[in-house]
Design a protein with these regions (language model features):
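Hydrophobic alpha-helical membrane segments, chiefly transmembrane helices and signal peptide h-regions
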Residues: 18-26, 51-53, 57, 72, ...
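C-terminal region of N-terminal signal peptides and the immediate post-cleavage residues
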Residues: 1-3, 11, 23-43
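Predominantly polar beta-repeat domains that present long G/T/S/D/N-rich surfaces used to bind, process
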Residues: 37-51, 122-125, 133, 144-210
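Feature marks extracellular polysaccharide-active and adherence modules
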Residues: 55, 63, 68, 74, ...
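N-terminal segments that cap or nucleate solenoid repeat domains
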Residues: 36-82, 207-210
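Bacterial N-terminal signal peptides that target proteins for export
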Residues: 4-18
Length: 210
């Protein structure tokens, strides 16, 4: 083949590739966004009597409320409690969406959060989520997106088990025992020791300086 023939073949290949690679003018890449916790679908302030049941895909917000009765959260439901008092147990069932419990207290009520999909925040040690008073046990089990339990007064025992993506238990005053098992990674205390009236056991929580 002569040089001119080679050049024509090369030009033809380049033209074909150009036709294949040309994208339409409307081509765009869709943005990827994280799934956010739902906004409040029900907000209660002031006094309320009776058990509260939060359904899936609903978010209950208690803001400066006095709730006389238990609070139960179904799978895919969410709960935010700020500046409130709950007389009764607070129970979040496996598959719930998220929990914030800040500057609040329970009266004769345990707090149990199992199998949460989103973050769990029960006190933060700063003004973003101030100290809570919990008149009962705290159970945090199999939550998937991180757990923070910090600077709280807890009248019962604390159990943290099988939580994923970071567990912080920091600066709490716990009247009962502190038990930690199968959390991944093992819990940290953020450099602030917990005061524990009962026994300490499991993972890093067994150490007296934790």
């Amino acid at each position: 083949m002569n040089h001119l023939h080679h050049q024509r073949i090369r030009q033809g290949i380049l033209a074909t590739l150009a036709g294949v690679l040309v994208l339409p003018a409307t081509w765009a890449i869709a943005p990827v966004t994280a799934q956010a916790a739902p906004d409040c679908t029900q907000t209660i302030s002031g006094a309320h009597s009776g058990v509260l049941n939060v359904a899936g895909n609903q978010k209950l917000c208690l803001k400066n409320a006095v709730q006389d009765g238990a609070v139960n959260v179904a799978p895919d439901g969410a709960l935010s409690v700020v500046g409130s008092t709950v007389t009764g147990a607070v129970t979040l069932k496996s598959g719930y969406s998220s929990l914030d419990f800040c500057a609040s207290k329970t009266v004769r009520g345990a707090l149990s959060a199992t199998g949460g999909k989103g973050a769990v925040l029960v006190g933060s040690g700063d003004l973003s989520c101030p100290t809570n008073n919990i008149d009962g046990a705290v159970t945090l089990d199999a939550n998937q997106s991180g757990v923070t339990l910090a600077q709280n007064y807890i009248a019962g025992a604390v159990t943290s088990s099988a939580n994923l993506n970071g567990t912080t238990i920091s600066g709490n005053r716990i009247a009962g025992a502190l038990t930690c098992t199968t959390n991944v990674p093992a819990p940290t205390n953020g450099g602030v020791r917990n005061s524990v009236g009962g026994g300490r056991s499991g993972q890093t929580c067994a150490v007296n300086t934790f």
